[in-house]
Amino acid sequence: MNKVAEIFREYGIKIDDSKTEKLDSYIDLLISAPINLTSLRDKEYAIHKHIVDIVFPVKMLTGKLLDVGTGGGIPGLILAILFPINATLVESVRKKVMWLEKILNMLNIGNVNLLCSRAEKLPADKKESFDIVTARAVSELRILLELCAPFCKVGGRLFFYKGPNWKQEYDAAHNAMKTLNVETIEIVSYTLKTGEKRVLLQFQKVGRTPDNYPRETKKILKNPL
């Protein structure tokens, strides 16, 4: 039994062996990457932090997924290994995208596309086109919403992974939710075996985003919604 499967068993997560083997290979490649994708080098802790954190609160996904600021492929690549989705991973750092290209080839992952771009620079034809938009460790919630909501279909969902201080961000994001036509579906709280408290904030897009969003980076940062 590989290490991912062993740790999944501790959480009661049931996944096909072929998928846990692929995830196990991925985490080995991630923690040994020659570029700075994670500060973690302990495999077991990295599995809790970078794989279980993504998988545990999610039951099933289908359709087209956009992962904003994917870094080393978290959460988008992990979700693409597990679920029948077509994922687009967006990352602005070219060397990270090049590393991800190698990983997709090495692990024979065919349901993932890569875009080297910032979210606010994505072409207009990407707006209102994804069933699911995800992000982890990119920015505070009201900024995340502006970066991500424009690319989600009406009726689609947005998933944001956050730590124990999420409530302050959430309370500050109500104007962003209203402006961008986003409503809360569910807030899933969970604790990793490492003791870390986590939440998955789930939103639904209930109307089209005004055409002027997302704004330029400097405007978003200087005057968040």
Curated annotation (Swiss-Prot):
Positions annotated to bind S-adenosyl-L-methionine: 69, 119-120, 136
A GO MF label: rRNA (guanine-N7-)-methyltransferase activity
EC number(s) given by UniProt: 2.1.1.-
Enzymatic class: transferase
GO CC annotations, alphabetized: cytosol
InterPro entries (alphabetical): rRNA_ssu_MeTfrase_G, SAM-dependent_MTases_sf
Pfam families linked to this entry: GidB
Location of this chain's protein in the cell: Cytoplasm
Keyword annotations from UniProtKB, A to Z: Cytoplasm, Methyltransferase, rRNA processing, S-adenosyl-L-methionine, Transferase
Alphabetized SUPFAM superfamilies for the sequence: S-adenosyl-L-methionine-dependent methyltransferases (SSF53335)
Function according to Swiss-Prot or TrEMBL: Specifically methylates the N7 position of a guanine in 16S rRNA.
Assigned protein family: Belongs to the methyltransferase superfamily. RNA methyltransferase RsmG family.
PANTHER family the record matches: S-ADENOSYL-L-METHIONINE-DEPENDENT METHYLTRANSFERASES SUPERFAMILY PROTEIN (PTHR31760:SF0)
Protein name: Ribosomal RNA small subunit methyltransferase G
Taxonomic path: Bacteria, Thermotogati, Thermotogota, Thermotogae, Thermotogales
